[in-house]
């Protein structure tokens, strides 16, 4: 479900000139806006991946593709806020969003690209190691062991790289936004039309 679904259309709008300058032209749409709970769940999923298993590695891209990242606001949709009256049983507090900048987005892209390592080359190396040899003596087994080691090394390297990138993501201090933070930092004013104009 996209983040904008947490907003409601109508009841007012942001000043268009402010929106165009401080949001559109400033590239705020290009950043990723991820709900705090969704981000924490995403990291939990990444921590659960066994990167040494090829079938598990493909899950990285799947988790990333499923991550909602759109801006939870528009010129006629106020940034997602609290729902209901505070203190009432149906009250829902204002959702919080992490704002991911270009550097963090690049880290996530790099993480998903680690899953694109080809498997055919390693299979070829293993097949080559199984070819019949004219000399069945014990020394002939040494090349086979070397080829096997060369086969697993790329996977070990990428698994180690995956852990490093994951640690960077977990330790990153991402800015947190609520409606108040968003409107204050971007200097946006929400206009409510007069009753006679509605």
From Swiss-Prot:
Domain of life: Viruses
Annotated segments matching region Disordered: 117-147
Organism per entry: Barley stripe mosaic virus
Description of how the protein assembles with itself and partners: Interacts with itself.
GO molecular function, one term: identical protein binding
Compartments where located: Virion
SUPFAM superfamilies xrefs: TMV-like viral coat proteins (SSF47195)
Protease among keywords: no
Gene3D superfamilies: Tobacco mosaic virus-like, coat protein
Alphabetical list of InterPro entries matching this protein: TMV-like_coat, TMV-like_coat_sf
Function: Capsid protein self-assembles to form rod-shaped virions about 21,6 nm in diameter for the narrow nes and 22,4 for the wide ones, and 110-150 nm in length depending on the size of the encapsidated RNA. They display a helical symmetry of 23.2 subunits per turn of the viral helix and with a central canal enclosing the viral genomic RNA.
Assigned protein family: Belongs to the virgaviridae capsid protein family.
Compositional bias per record (Basic and acidic residues), positions renumbered to this chain: 119-128
Keywords, in A-Z order: Capsid protein, Helical capsid protein, Virion
Protein name per Swiss-Prot or TrEMBL: Capsid protein
Signal as UniProt keyword: no
Other comment: The genome of this virus consists of three linear, positive, single-stranded RNAs encapsidated in separate virions designated RNA-alpha, RNA-beta and RNA-gamma. Three proteins (alpha-A, beta-A and gamma-A) are translated directly from these genomic RNAs and the remaining proteins encoded on RNA-beta (beta-B, beta-C and beta-D) and RNA-gamma (gamma-B) are expressed via three subgenomic messenger RNAs.
GO CC terms: helical viral capsid
